Amino acid sequence: MQISDTGHSHMPDFHAVLAREDWQNQTITHLNRLPAHPAFASWRDELAARDNHLSTRRRQLDGEWQFVYARSPFAVDAQWLTQDLPDSRGTPVPSNWQMEGYDAPIYTNVRYPIDTTPPRVPEDNPTGCYSLHFTVEDTWRENGQTQIIFDGVNSAFHLWCNGVWVGYSQDSRLPAAFDLSPFLRPGDNRLCVMVMRWSAGSWLEDQDMWRMSGIFRSVWLLNKPQQRLCDVQLTPALDALYRDGTLQVQATVEATEAALAGLSVGVSLWRGEEQVAAGRQPLGTPAVDERGHYAERVDFALAVTAPAHWSAETPNCYRAVVTLWRGDELLEAEAWDIGFRRIEIADGLLRLNGKPLLIRGVNRHEHHYLRGQVVTEADMVQDILLMKQNNFNAVRCSHYPNAPRWYELCNRYGLYVVDEANIETHGMVPMNRLSDDPAWLPAFSARVTRMVQSNRNHPCIIIWSLGNESGGGGNHEALYHWLKRNDPSRPVQYEGGGADTTATDIICPMYARVERDQPIPAVPKWGIKKWISLPGEQRPLILCEYAHAMGNSLGNFADYWQAFREYPRLQGGFIWDWADQAIRKIFDDGSVGWAYGGDFGDKPNDRQFCMNGLVFPDRTPHPSLVEAKHAQQYFQFTLLSTSPLRVRITSEYLFRPTDNEVVRWQVQSAGETLYHGNLTLALPPEGSDEITLLDSLILPEGARAVWLTLEVTQPRATDWSEADHRVAWQQFPLPAPLALPAPTVPAGAPDLIVSDEVWQIRAGSQCWTIDRRTGLLSRWSVGGQEQLLTPLRDQFIRAPLDNDIGVSEVERIDPNAWVERWKSAGLYDLEAHCVQCDAQRLANETLVDCRWHYLRGEEVVIVSHWRMHFTADGTLRLAVDGERAETLPPLPRVGLHFQVADQQAPVSWLGLGPHENYPDRRSSACFARWEQPLAAMTTPYIFPTENGLRCDTQALDWGRWHVSGHFHFSVQPWSTRQLMETDHWHKMQAEDGVWITLDGLHMGVGGDDSWTPSVLPQWLLSQTRWQYEFFLRCL
C-alpha cells in the first residue's frame, strides 16, 4: 500500500462541509477514515509488546474536553473551529451528553424516535461540539503517521484539526481512525469534533435501548512509523485430530513502493516468557492471478506442536507478536492474545475442538446506570465475573460490536462471544425495507466488514452475526457470502428472515417455545423440538434470544434446559437480557430512584420495557439469576437408590477435569440434619461417577419432609470466583416412614360469646372477634394486645407482573394480556357479600362457618367458604374451599392476606428458599429451614409488581405469628394495592404494619416472552374448584 503526501490547502471550509449534509446520505459512510484494522499499539520493542507494557506511541485523550450544545449543525458558529464559544463548558470524554445535562435520553424498543423518512433525519438535529487542546512530541510530528482513533461516537461526526477539516464517520459502535499527520503543528493543537445525534446511520441503529449521543468511548493518539503494519490477520487453527496447531498470518504493510523491497515481517508466539514458535519472511505473496502478486502483503504459517487449547473452560492464551523489520532494524511491533481452537459445524452440531457446545448464554447491552452507554474496564470485569459465577459461558454482543477491551477480557477470562454487526431496522415497515434495498448495501457492508477486520483476531469470538431484527434481504445474503469467503474459520448466524433464511449457518430464533408453534405469517416460529426435525433441516439450533427476564419472570426456564439436554441439536441459547437498563435519576420531588422510558420527558417511549435484566442496573442479582445458574450448572445428579443411598454425578465440562471440586451432602428431616458428609470429586471431562453416600439410610421415628441435598463447591479461588464458590446443587425427596404421630387435640373448647354484632371466642390469653355482618375475623388479641391491623380476607389478585401486562407499546391495549382479561372480568373490583356466618361451640373446638359471594355487578362469580376451627391452645385451623364461575379467566392466586403490626423479627420458614420462587420458577430453590430479615423477603423490582413469594411451605414463623400446613407465602411491608398503584419502586411508601399473604394456589409467572400470555397450561389456575388449609397461631 503506497503512502501519498496529503496536503490540506484544498480542504473545504466549515460552511461548505455542513452544506454537503453528509449525515443525510446513506451512501457516505465515511470520508477520509482509515481502513479498519485490529487494535494497534505500535511498540518499538518486541518484549514490551510481548509483555503488553504501555506503549510510548499510544496516548489516551480521555478527560475533560470543552463542549457546546446546539439544536442543529447549522446553529454552530464557525468561530468554534478556532476558539471556544462563550457558552462552552467542560465535559468528560467519554460520556453521553444526555447524562451530562444536555438534551434527553430516549428509550424506545421498536419505534424509531424520529419520523421514519430514511435516509433523511430531522433538520432539528441535536449537535454536540467537542474541542480539545493538545500537544504531540516533535518526534511524532516529524516521523511516521499520527492517527487519532475514536472507539465509539454516536451517531456521526465531522472532525477538524487546527481549523482544517479532517474527515467524517458514521457507525456508532466501531472504531474510526484518521491520519492527523498533515494537520499537526508544533506546540498547541486544537481538535474539534462535531457530533450529530441523528444521521442516515441512525436508520440502522434501531436497537431496543436508550438512544444517547456523544463521544462515549475512549479517544486515542497513535504514532506509527513511516513504514508500518496497517493490517494483521491471525488465524490459529487445529488439525483434524485437534492435536497440533497452525498459526496462519497475513500482514499488510504501508510504505512507499521503493521501501517495500527491503522489508520483512516476523512473528513470534509466546506462552508467558517461553517462545513456542517463530518465523520471518520478506514482504510479497506468490502470484495470485495472471497480473501478479501483492507486494505489500505477506502470508505464512507457524506450526505449533500440541498447543494448549482455548475454550471458555480453559482460556489458554498465547501472545502473538508481529514485527516489521528493515534488514535487522526493528521498525515496529504489534501483539495480540490468541487462542488455538477449532470452531465448526459437523453432523448438525456446533463444535469446539470436536466437542458439541452447550451455549449457556446471555445478551448484554453496554449500559451503566450513571454513565449511560459508557462502560469502564471495571464495569466489564464485574459483568464477566458475575456471568462466570452464575454458570454462563457465552455472551451475545447485542446488538453491536462492543468496546475493544471487552473482547480482550473475554479472551482472558473465558467467554464465548457472538459478535454482532451494528444493524437493526426493527421499526421499518416492512422490517426488511432497507435490507432488501441495494442503495443501502454500502452502509450494511461497512458495518459487517469493518467489524470483522477490527475483531477477527480474538479467540473468544466464535460466531459472527449479521445484525438483529432487520428482516431478510439481499444485503444480508451478500454479506453472508462475504463472511464465508473472508473468514471461513467461524460460522455466521442471523435470525432475521425467519425459519427458512439461508443467510445463517445456525437456526437462531428468538422466543421460540419448547413445544408450542407460533405460526406467524411469513416468519413462523416452530417449537424448538419440532424445528430441528423439519424435513431437510440439518443445522444446529441456538436461540439468539429466549427467556425474557423482564421483572418477575423466567418461568418455564428449566423446561428449555431439559430440552437442550435431551436433544443434542438444541444447543442452548442467550437469555434476554443481562441487566436492567434503568438510569439513576433525581426526580422533580427530590427523590432518587431508577428511571425508565418517559421519565425524561422523552417521546415516544416504551416505558419500563428497557428493564429485562437478570440483574438490577447496579448488578444486584434478581432471583431469576439463581434459577438460570441452577439450570445451566455443569453437573447433573441422579438418585440411584435410597438404601443404600447412592447417586450419580455427571460433569458437563467438555475440556477440564474436576480438579477443584468438592461434593457436600446432607440428609435433612423437616430442616434438621440427620446425616452429612464431604467428598472430593475427581472426574475427567464429560465423566461421571456413582457414589455411595450411606450403606443404609435409617430414619428416626417421626421423620418427615426428608430431603437429600447435594452441592458442588470449589475450595480454591479461581480467576473469577472466591474460595468455596458453589457451582451446582440439587435436591431429592427421600421416602419417610408412613406412620406419623397422631395430632394432639387439646381438651375443651374456647368460650363462645355471642352478641348481635360479633362472635367473640376466648381461649386463655387469646381472643378472636368475628364480625357477624361481614363474616371477617376482624380482631385477634393476645393478652389484651391487638395483633391485626386488617381482617383476614380472601385474596384473588396480584399486582400485575410485566408478563401479565403484555405489550411494550403502552398506548395499545392487548385484550389477550392477563391483566386485561382480569380487568374485563372485574376481578379487581369484586364486591364481597357475606351470605352465611354461623358459630357453634363443640366438644374440642369452637367452629365459625362463613360463606361469601363475590359479585361482578349482580353476578356471583366466586364463592368462598371458610371453616374457622378455634382450639383451646390458641390455634386457628382455617379450612377453605371455593369455586369460580367458568366465565372467569384463570385466577392469578387463591389465598388470603391480612396486615399485622411489625414484629421487628427475622422471617423463618420450612419450605423452598432462600430466594423468591414461584410455581414455574422454583427448580433452584431448596427445601430447608430458612431465616432471613424482613427486608430480604421483598424483591424491589423497579416497576413494582407481585414479588417475594416462597413456595411449598410447611411452616412459617415471624415474631408472634406461626403458620403451618401446605402453602405459599409472602411477608412484606407493602400492600398489593400499593404495588398496583405505584409505577416506580422508589415511590413506595411505608405502611403501618406488615402484610402476610398465604396462598393455597398461585399462578406461574411465565417468561418465554413478555408480550404474549406465556404461562404454561400446567401453571395456570384453570380449575374452577379449590380447597386448602392452614393452622395459624399468634403467641
UniProtKB/Swiss-Prot annotation:
Record-annotated active site: E469 (proton donor), E545 (nucleophile)
Site keyed Transition state stabilizer: positions: H365, H399
Q: Does the keyword Isomerase apply?
A: no
Top EC category: hydrolase
In its UniProt entry, what is this protein called? Beta-galactosidase
What are the BP-aspect GO terms?
Answer: lactose catabolic process
Which NCBIfam families does this entry report, sorted A to Z?
Answer: PRK09525.1
Subunit comment: Homotetramer.
Q: Where does Na(+) bind?
A: D208, F609, N612
Source organism: Klebsiella pneumoniae (strain 342)
Cysteine pairings via disulfide bonds: none
The upper taxonomy is: Bacteria, Pseudomonadati, Pseudomonadota, Gammaproteobacteria, Enterobacterales
User: What family does the Swiss-Prot or TrEMBL record give for this protein?
Assistant: Belongs to the glycosyl hydrolase 2 family.
**PANTHER family on file:** BETA-GALACTOSIDASE
